[in-house]
Swiss-Prot record:
Keywords: Cell outer membrane, Membrane, Signal
Residues of the signal peptide: 1-21
GO biological process: Gram-negative-bacterium-type cell outer membrane assembly; lipopolysaccharide transport
HAMAP family with a match to the protein in the record: LPS_assembly_LptD (MF_01411)
Subcellular location(s) per record: Cell outer membrane
Protein name as catalogued: LPS-assembly protein LptD
Pfam families the UniProt entry points to: LptD, LptD_N
PANTHER family: LPS-ASSEMBLY PROTEIN (PTHR30189), LPS-ASSEMBLY PROTEIN LPTD (PTHR30189:SF1)
Length: 839
């Protein structure tokens, strides 16, 4: 028969008010105590699973089960102590004994055992400790310990547990299950920190042998959410694979300092690659990741990323440094005779990348984007992302923007580092803007509903000297003043609109170093008016398609543009160029980009758009547009520049269209969503002047579930493929390029990822990678291999960077340094969610 504490017992163990009850604890406490030195067998693991509250569930696809929750109903007062037992023997001057279904509760701490001994201070008669023996179960919120012996100290709420099987629920970012393990001793401190002696630690299910940490000691800091294992071994399927004297790991979602999972890889240009990242959580709003890389063919590279977030600023600084690159030294030695430009280059390789956005005031913002590399070959040697490997212009820009109700003011400095790898198509440098000053105003409350846009811009253009293109070193440079006020009067009705507009463009140039024209200075002033009339109608009707009701719109649009001709071939080209023709170009007021060329025009654009909108939600299911420009005169303004004032553009120049044909290409665009998972977009432009396709693209995206993705794309650009020929000249050919990428689950835990990009024009691949990924309950693994186009060799055949990487993620023990070693997954598989990504 269970009994409550009698009155005589009350005087013995009273501690700041004792509450007691005669309720009987009927739940049995299982005997799950096995000495720490006993090896785990399958039978023992099965027994441990029951002890820890593991519930097998085959409907749980990843973990195949779950833990029963740990619930403790707290007492009314955190200092209240309640003790129950079947029998009790009390002594005023000795320890007291409680036997049979013993349960003690203090606040949210509950301890069950078969036997308990109560000790008191002989002077104060206050309870100093309670010792529990035989089938001990120790519970706290998110904590369970089953042990041979436990000692609790009611006064400071600390305790010790011996020969322990434990389960600690922790809120980690990537672990699906609580941590569990064994220890010869666990100390629970008054601040709720824990010290585990001769302990194991894993977040795998009890019967899963995937991985475990076996350590001399493990300290868990509850406040910092951090665990530290000392003299630790990492066991994979019970085999020791790694020893470390110190291992730090998180116990909650907060960022923690410590080593991250290593990066292991191999490439044909760098050899074997081992990266050992260390994450330093400097402050809640500052952190740094240091990544030393060992390349067997190159040497030791030290890299890092520093991130910061303040009330006004956010930014990232990335840097890498590799002294005395062995492979690069051999490259210079082998090629410096044939290519003297590379003679004297340093073998110290480095890069810096700085991005910052600072909001000084609500209307004053600074943006910085700076990138620099040590030499022309750095990106080829150390990047596996096609967009980076083939990049030849690195931006360096800072701008300060101030906004008011009607005006925006901006000051900017901009330059580029131009890369010139040997035996490749020469790349022309880009003009520096040092500085650019811009003011843009907008007023929409004028009489007659008129709107006024004003743009004023000053650019100081500077041409960087380039040892690779000496012939271009005497290019023109100097200031350019640009003014462009626009007055328009939009007249809007529910059924349509008409917007007449008038504007003028004024450019002033003060040119120095006028290259080979025999003059050192020249001034040009240009004032050109523009007139336009834009109008459109809106029609709609109900549409019923496959059981769904839609609203179909029909939107015809006309746009007339008149710009008189002014000869501009004497004026240098700082930032103007041809643009790829598509639907968007139908309604532009200038067929050139930038401000240096103001295209003459006497033309009418006509287009038709139809949309399908879901009747209930308004979501757009389809959008189809088609249009063309009718020219009433030839286009006389040329992009080229000449000291004689007369020149003709090369018809094979990328983006150039016929200047004499009576109509523009026919531009069309389609967007269609078959369902929420499947959509297709495409542009097709047909040129009647050449009776051929001018450019086209088609993109397909299919994503029925997260990380079940198929993307396909094709693009065609006439004259878009610049090819180097044997005599070091270049020729323009049509560019055909296709890309296919996918991420698809192969089973509940296995998935495949891959992408392939092929240059149909040149008959070789640009980029390809293929990987397989395993994502289980407590660990994940990914192996990813591929190659990226690097350059052409002496025989004008493609050369590639070949890479393979292995990543292993032990969930609950830390994250990897980056979402993937090469940074290509999110680039080439839009919509992909990376389980390896550090949040």
């Amino acid at each position: 028969m269970a009994i409550g504490i009698t009155a005589c017992v009350l005087s013995l163990i009273n501690y700041q008010g004792l509450a007691y009850s005669a309720a009987l604890i009927n739940e049995p406490i299982q005997a799950c105590v096995i000495a720490r030195e006993v090896d785990l067998t399958d039978d023992i693991r099965t027994k441990f699973a029951q002890c820890l509250g593991w519930q097998a569930d085959q409907s749980s696809p990843v973990c195949l089960g779950f833990y029963k929750p740990i619930t403790v109903t707290p007492l009314a007062s955190p200092d209240e102590v309640r003790i129950l037992a079947d029998t009790a023997s009390f002594y005023r001057t000795q320890r007291s004994t409680l036997s049979g279904h013993v349960e003690m509760q203090q606040g949210q701490r509950v301890v069950n055992a078969q036997t308990a001994y109560v000790y008191r201070d002989p002077k104060t008669n206050e309870v100093t400790k309670i010792e529990f023996l035989n089938h001990v179960r120790y519970l706290e919120p998110d904590r369970m310990m089953i042990a041979r012996k436990a000692v609790v100290y009611p006064q400071d709420k600390s305790g010790e547990v011996e020969d322990v099987l434990y389960r600690f629920n922790t809120n980690r970012s990537n672990a699906l299950l609580p941590a569990w393990g064994r220890a010869s001793l666990i100390k629970r401190f008054a601040n709720q920190d824990y010290f585990l002696k001769e302990a194991t630690y894993t977040t795998c299910a009890p019967q899963d042998k995937a991985w475990a940490i076996e350590a001399e000691s493990i300290s868990i800091n509850n406040e910092k959410g951090k665990g530290i294992a000392r003299n630790a071994k990492l066991r994979i399927h019970e085999w020791p694979v790694l020893y470390t004297p110190y291992l730090s790991f998180p116990t909650n979602r907060d960022r923690k300092s410590g080593f991250l999972m290593p990066i292991v890889g191999y490439s044909n240009v760098g050899g074997a690659d081992l990266g050992i990242p260390y994450y330093w959580n400097m402050a809640p709003n500052y952190d740094m990741t240091l990544v030393p890389h060992i390349y067997t063919k190159r040497g030791l590279m030290l890299g890092g990323q520093f991130r910061y977030l303040t009330s006004k600023s956010t930014g990232t600084f990335n840097g890498n440094f590799l002294p005395k690159d062995k492979a690069f030294g051999r490259f210079l030695q082998d090629n410096e005779v044939e290519f003297p430009q590379i003679r004297g280059l340093s073998t110290n390789r480095w890069e810096v990348n700085f991005v910052d956005s600072t909001q000084f005031l609500s209307d004053l913002q600074l943006n910085v984007n700076f990138q620099q590399v040590s030499d022309d070959y750095y990106l080829q040697d150390f990047s596996t992302n096609l967009a980076s490997v083939t990049q030849r212009q690195l931006l360096r820009q800072a701008d300060l923007t101030y906004t008011t109700e009607n005006w925006t003011f901006r000051g900017m400095g901009q330059s580029y580092q131009t890369l010139h790898p040997i035996n490749e198509i020469p790349v022309s440098p880009v003009y520096e803007r040092l500085p650019q000053l811009m003011a843009r105003g907008y007023y929409d409350d004028l009489p007659f509903n008129a709107q006024l846009n004003i743009l004023g811009q000053y650019d100081q253009f500077h041409w960087p000297n380039d040892s690779w293109n000496i012939a271009l070193n005497n290019m023109p440079q100097g200031p350019r003043f640009h003014l462009n006020p626009i007055l328009s009067v939009p007249m809007m009705k529910p059924w349509g609109y008409v917007t007449p507009s008038v504007q003028f463009v004024e450019n002033y140039y003060d040119i120095s170093r006028n290259y080979t024209w025999g003059t050192s200075r020249a001034n040009y002033n240009l004032t050109i008016p523009r007139y336009s009339l834009d109008g459109g109608l809106y029609f709609e009707r109900d549409l019923h398609l496959k059981g769904t009701y839609y609203i179909q719109t029909l939107e015809p649009r006309l746009f007339y543009l008149r710009v008189p001709y002014y000869n501009q071939t004497l004026i240098p080209v700082y930032d103007s160029g041809f643009m790829i023709f598509n639907v968007d170009q139908l309604f532009r007021t200038n067929r050139f980009s930038g401000f240096d060329r103001i295209g003459d025009a006497n033309q009418l654009s006509y287009a038709l758009t139809t949309r399908w909108l879901e009747d209930e939600s308004g979501a757009e299911k389809a959008n189809f547009s088609i249009g063309q420009i009718k020219y009433f005169s030839e286009r006389r303004v040329q992009l080229c520049q000449s000291p004689t004032g007369f020149c003709t553009d090369n018809p094979d120049t990328f983006g150039n269209l016929s200047s004499t044909f009576g109509t523009s290409p026919v531009a069309s665009r389609a967007v269609y969503k078959f369902n929420p998972a499947w959509g297709i977009t495409g542009d097709y432009i047909w040129d009647p002047a050449t009776r051929a396709t001018n450019n086209a693209d088609l993109n397909l995206h299919y994503q029925p579930a997260r990380n079940a993705i198929i993307n396909g794309g094709y693009s065609y650009l006439v004259n878009g493929d610049v090819t180097q020929v044997r005599n070091n000249d270049t020729e323009n050919n049509a560019l055909h390029q296709a890309i296919l990428s996918a991420a698809w689950p192969l089973s509940e835990k296995w998935s495949g990822i891959g992408a392939y990009s092929y240059n149909i024009s040149k008959n070789y691949s640009m980029m390809s990678f293929l990987g397989v990924q395993y994502d289980s309950c407590c660990w994940a693994m990914r192996i990813l291999g591929g190659r990226t186009f690097r350059s052409l060799n002496e025989e004008f055949e493609p050369r590639y960077n070949n890479n393979i990487y292995l990543q292993i993620l032990l969930k609950g023990l830390g994250s990897v340094a980056s979402s993937d070693p090469s940074g290509i997954l999110n680039t080439y598989i839009p919509g992909y969610y990376d389980p390896f990504r550090r949040r």
